[in-house]
Amino acid sequence: MLFRTAGTPINFLKHASPDGRRIIFLQDKERSKRHMKKRIIVCVLTLLMLSLMTACGGGTNPDGNTDGFPVPEGEPSYGGEITVGITADLDSSLDPHVSSSSAGTREVLFNVFEGLMKTDPEGNMVPAVAESYTVNDAADEYTFVLRKGIKFHNGNDVTVDDVVYSLSRAAGLETGEPLVADVANIKSVKATGDDTIVIKLAAPDTEFLAHITTAIIPKDIDPSKEVVGTGPFKFAGRKVQDNIVLEKFGEYWGEPAYLDKVTLKVIDNSETLVMSLKSGAIDMATHLIASQVKELQGLNIVEGPSNAVQALYINNSFKPFSDVRVRQALCYAVNKQDILDLAFDGYGSLVGSSMFPALKNYFMDDLTNYYEPDPAKAKELLTEAGYPDGIEFTITVPSTMQQHVDTAQVIVEQLQAAGITAKINQVDWTTWLEDVYKGRKFEATVVSLDSHGVAASDLLARFQSDNAKNFINFSSEEYDAAYKKAISTVDPEAQTEAFKECETILTEQAANVYIQDTSSFVAMGADYYGYVYYPLYVADFAKVYKFAE
């Protein structure tokens, strides 16, 4: 039985904002009826609207252009606080160099820590702790000049020694064991003056600027016990499995945060999360799905991409999935457009490989429909592989992530037409991390894999045969060669083509059943504004504000 009956469309109107978001204000029933009659037209026009929004560019600016959606009169005010519901607690350690397994943890720590560079809302790499940089022609030596006057949250000035310590630690230069895979290519980090450091790489890397977002921390603290960064918010406290508190950092070098305090409340039940929004127990929640925001009358809803690849991720070493024909059969048995329509009310962007549309230089739209739904073809492939009576397997899904539970339920129904029997095992997030992601003790799972940066390698590196994050156990000499070619060239065009070759191999070899970049909805109380989507999985609380009364 399907998880629910496909209901009526979400009752809201969409307005284009300058930064490419869609601001949604829930409307009354009479307006909703008129909107429903126009749904088909809206779906077509949305495609045009998206292209226009992309052209607009720019981040959210409370004082700037607000054409296209209503904004209350008055000025954004500094001060106040917000309570944000999150569906899972952060990692047990908030050491920024080791707490990278959870996307949710990285999402929050984005507000606390900064690297030499950071990503802006348009996906550009811009200086943060660094003020400027130069790169040699071989792309194997990067020189950074530090920004003057930056302070850590403990009040100390940021020095070149702190930067050298942070990057050396993250790259494992003393231990030989990198803590952060993105900077494992660093061969040496040296200070050449009071404000200048030179980083030499073991191999050329034209994407290195996208990797040097690794947190800069003080050299004289224990990062396993103290959470000290340079971001717009400082860590103020935590109650495990209950809440995390961030406070505004008054000496932040950049644009100050509007809010004085952000409390992240752990609510591990999706229904309770929605009820908490409706009752006002919390003011904001991110990563909601269409069926949830239907219920949130009177709240401001912002829609944007998740910038993560949702798929039925397959353990390629598990028999029968070690046979490419079986994996391809799964691809033919799944109708991802139906998944969008049934589980997401049509919201989302279909994908065909491990790349999402926001990384437009690398995204390959022609792979989206590489496997047209064909249950008969799926049965044929299973028979060729020696399974004429079909196969059975278990899909392990994080129980707190309703969008993935819903997707898995639709998939289970679809697979039956191809003679495939699947059952769902819902587990808590901690169990999923330990058993699936780290332990690789699973057959298949439905999740979304995000990119912690804007480099293609952030999404594709994990599928190398020997990569520690290759939890699906995908192994392909062809893929490894293509990836090596991509990261070793200094020719941007050749690199892009090599990364696209990697994407094509993942699709052709059916490493996973790729589905979509899900639409993500952020709900905020009616007096909160300013949320900005980035082309990666982060939540920027510094831009959220209230209007002065």
Regions found by a protein language model. Name each.
Residues 83, 159-166, 194-198, 231-232, ...:
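Alpha-helical secondary-structure segments
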Residues 333-361, 403-412, 433, 437-549:
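Detector for C-terminal structural segments
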Residues 134, 138, 178-220:
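Surface-exposed binding/hinge segments that line
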Residues 349-384, 401-404:
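Structural transition elements
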Residues 121-124, 205-263, 269-272, 376, ...:
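Gly/Pro-rich hinge or "lid" segments in bacterial periplasmic/extracellular proteins
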Residues 85-135, 168, 228:
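N-terminal lobe/hinge region of extracytoplasmic solute-binding protein
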Residues 249-294, 421:
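Ligand-site clamp/hinge motif
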Residues 87-106, 129-130, 156, 208-215, ...:
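A structural "hinge/loop" feature
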